[in-house]
């Protein structure tokens, strides 16, 4: 198996884990699947670094391991503490429909990325299609889920997808760019988690349908 095939397969595994993040009922399981997905992303960065002798991506992989594999799951686990796991959740789409939509999104993205010239290798276009699809799947999660914590997970999925797109298209970007992206993502998750916890303590619900009357 060539290096490009390994990267493409790992990218496909990222899409699969994202469906588990969205679909499982337990918040802690979602955190676990997100950590696994982020570990796959770190593996992709490390593989690309070895294939193309890109020291920047090795630094990216170390940064992503600290922020995405360790910090974000810990923050999301904190957000879910003391929140019952058996609260009925409403969503526009069930797990089966989300899987079908994910497949359609990746198929559409495969056509979109055809004209794109990758600076690394043309054999990585499937990974680029999955990365773009991963971003859109995170956006779909935000739109379709009615639970605030699920929407935060959707943001995290979007961030992972955009991170992989950046690695494939602009992998020579300075390390400061990667540090800035990771820092922004961490602070965004922290702010959203604090707001979600405040809403839960005040109103006893995380369903956005019940929060339409909130005033600033």
Swiss-Prot record:
It is an enzyme of class 1 (oxidoreductase). Keywords: Cell inner membrane, Cell membrane, Membrane, Oxidoreductase, Transmembrane, Transmembrane helix. The chain crosses the membrane at residues 4-24, 39-59, 60-80, 93-113, 123-143, 151-171, 176-196. Its main location: membrane. The keyword Membrane applies. One of its GO terms (biological process) is anaerobic respiration. Residues 25-38, 81-92, 144-150, 197-216 are cytoplasmic. GO terms for molecular function: oxidoreductase activity. InterPro entries: HyfE-like (IPR038730), NUOK/Mnh_C1-like (IPR039428). Residues 1-3, 114-122, 172-175 are periplasmic. It is a multi-pass membrane protein. It is found in: Cell inner membrane. Its EC number is 1.-.-.-. GO terms for cellular component: formate dehydrogenase complex; membrane; plasma membrane. Possible component of hydrogenase 4. This is Hydrogenase-4 component E. It comes from Escherichia coli (strain K12).
